[in-house]
Each structure stands twice: as structure tokens, then as C-alpha cells.
């Protein structure tokens, strides 16, 4: 049983981390060409919602103004006006393709995230025994660490999550999650989450020290405060 506890959790933990990612990645790559073909053939006209249509029109107007400005400066003859119209047409098609690719990316990312969630849910439902062994293995590993190493690890983790330089890391992480789920970048929402998450984590962490660590390991709390000061 001791040997099982020592070696079984390692491949199981690796499968929890890498298996959902590998299956989702394979699913994404295998269906990408089919989804692109289906989207381009079944949705020839209505490919934008109101917000996206507004964004496309704004970009198109900006593009048209740039072309007109270029024509006014260079004073091209009528032959170049025709080239100008062709250029506008090509750029419009490019904008349509770009937004279609955004829709396809959102659909694929949403599907792969659902698959990853389903796999992790299957682990939690079907792998109760393995999770118990993994939990006991982690507890035993943490218990064997010295209080100094524990305090250093807690201090390092808190500085990374709620320290002075943590907002930039949170901004990158939230932006990555936004892109992973297919959402467009929004500075207001990201700045709001960046200013909120560290405060919530700091409150939870202080409560955890006060409620749990003071009761379980007072010496660890003393070492942590000494290192933090």
C-alpha cells in the first residue's frame, strides 16, 4: 500500500494535467477543416452580429478614408480610381474572412473547453479511489516538509499572486483566459478583474492563516511573519 501511494499518484496526476489538453487539442485540429468548410458554405451572408457588424463597418470606413486620402495626395487619374475600388473590395473580403475566422475560433475553443470540463468531471466522478490516494500523497508530502520551507513556499506564492508586481501577471492570465474562450479583448473588464482578484485572494489567505494555520502549526505562522517582515 505504501508503494502504491508513492508511485500511483504521479502518472494519475500527469494524466489529469495532460490528457484533457491532448484530447482537446486533437479534437480541435481534427475538426478545424470541417468547421471551416461548414461555416463558409452554410453561412454565406449572415456571419456577423450587430456588434461585430458595427466593428467591421468602422474598420471599413477607416480603410476607405485612408484610400481616399492617398488618392487626394497623389492625384491619380481615373485608371487608378478603378484600382482603388478593387483594393476596397479586396480589403472588405479580407475583413469578412477575419471575422469568420474569429467565429470559427470561438466555436472550436468553446467545444474544446467543454470536452476538457467533461474529462475532468469524469475524473472526479469515476476516480474517487485514485483521488483519495492522491490527496493522502500530497498531504504526506507537505507534512514532511520543514516549517521553514513551508513558510518560504507560502511567501513566494503570495508574492506571486497578491504581491506588488502581481497585477501585470493577472492581466496576462485573464487576457489569456479571455482569448482561450474566444472573447475579444476588453480593457475595462480586465482592469476590473485585475483590481478585484488580488484583494479577494489576500482576504481569503489572511483568513486561512488566522483560522487554520494558527491552530495546526503556530510555529509556521511565526516563521512566516518573521520572513515577511
From Swiss-Prot:
Ranges that cross the membrane: 7-27, 114-134, 154-174, 189-209
Family: Belongs to the CemA family.
Major subcellular site: plastid
Gene Ontology biological-process annotations: potassium ion transport
Keyword vocabulary terms for this entry: Antiport, Chloroplast, Hydrogen ion transport, Ion transport, Membrane, Plastid, Plastid inner membrane, Potassium, Potassium transport, Transmembrane, Transmembrane helix, Transport
Highest taxon listed in the record's lineage: Eukaryota
GO molecular function ontology, one term from the record: proton transmembrane transporter activity
InterPro entries: CemA
Chemical reaction(s) catalysed: K(+)(in) + H(+)(out) = K(+)(out) + H(+)(in)
Species in which this protein is naturally found: Nandina domestica (Heavenly bamboo)
Stretches assigned to coiled coil: none
Gene coding for it: cemA
Gene Ontology CC entries for this record: chloroplast inner membrane
Cell compartments where the protein resides: Plastid, Chloroplast inner membrane
Membrane disposition: Multi-pass membrane protein
Its biological purpose: Contributes to K(+)/H(+) antiport activity by supporting proton efflux to control proton extrusion and homeostasis in chloroplasts in a light-dependent manner to modulate photosynthesis. Prevents excessive induction of non-photochemical quenching (NPQ) under continuous-light conditions. Indirectly promotes efficient inorganic carbon uptake into chloroplasts.
Pfam families for the chain: CemA
Protein name according to UniProt: Potassium/proton antiporter CemA
